[in-house]
Each structure stands twice: as structure tokens, then as C-alpha cells.
Amino acid sequence: MTLALITGSSGHAGATLIRELINQNYKVRCIDFDNDHRAYEGLDVDLIEGDITKKDSLWKIFEDVDVVFHTAAFICLDRRYKDLIRNVNVNGTRNVCDVALKSGVKKMIHFSSVDAFNRFPIDEPLLEDKELVNDKNAIPYDLSKADAQRVVLEYCNKGLETSI
């Protein structure tokens, strides 16, 4: 049975994904970050305490994992939280990628955001080949998602099989 790890499992995308993976006969492991299990209460999931911003907490979680679905993110548009946004979205993604690569994970699926892409000029279609946000004065969340995507691409070049 394929073991899938979901980061951000208590969020909307993660909680929805849990149900779909269980329906497809995956064994599902979740990072228990905040003890909030309401999103998947009563479901057959393996919970292991951890925090993507603390790399040392991830090694045990990644043992025997076949595929990682990285949905975790700190979604906030308030510039006052720029350091926290960057720590979770960029540094956390780097930790997930690094541990996945070194643990022999076969595949990682990274959940990015439309906000990672430069939306200007506004009247053009926003396609996935659009340039990533690179303006240091951009909304911190947008820049963090763009930089997280760059991290994933960097690890793809190091040998981690990824989809974004």
C-alpha cells in the first residue's frame, strides 16, 4: 500500500485530499502541527507530531513515505507577519524538500498558488508559464509562494521528482 504524507492536513486542501487518498486505498500520514484534528476526525490516518519549520521534527515523519503532498502554507496578506509567512512558506518548503529528497521519497506534489505569479499586465491570461513574482516590495504572501516554488524547482534539479 502506498504511504502518502500530507503537510497542511488540517487545512481545506489537505483535509479534502485525505478523504480522496483514503478512497483510493492509500495509507495516509499527517503532520500533527497544532492538535486540531477536526478536519479529519474519525478517519484512518497516521498522526505524527511535527512542524515543517523545524527540520529535525520531520525525519521520523518521512520514514517509509512514498509520496508527499505539500499543502501547508501560512496564508496572510498582512505585511506585519512577513517573517512568519516567509518562515512557513519558504523555509518550511525547503525543509520538506530536503527531507523528502534525503529520505528517498519517490514523488512530491507541491501546492502552489496563483499568487506566486506576476499578474501584470492585468488584462493578459494568467498561465503557468507566466513569470514568478520577484518584486521585493510585493505582498509578502505572493513573494513567499513564488520563492517556495523556486525552492521546489531547485530540488527538482537535485533529483526530487516533483509536480507543482
Positions of PLM-derived features:
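Active-site Tyr-X1-5-Lys
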Residues: N137-S163
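Conserved Rossmann-fold NAD(P)-dependent oxidoreductase catalytic core, especially the SDR/UDP-sugar
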Residues: N95-Y141, S163
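N-terminal Rossmann NAD(P)H-binding glycine-rich loop of SDR-like oxidoreductase domains
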Residues: A4-Q24
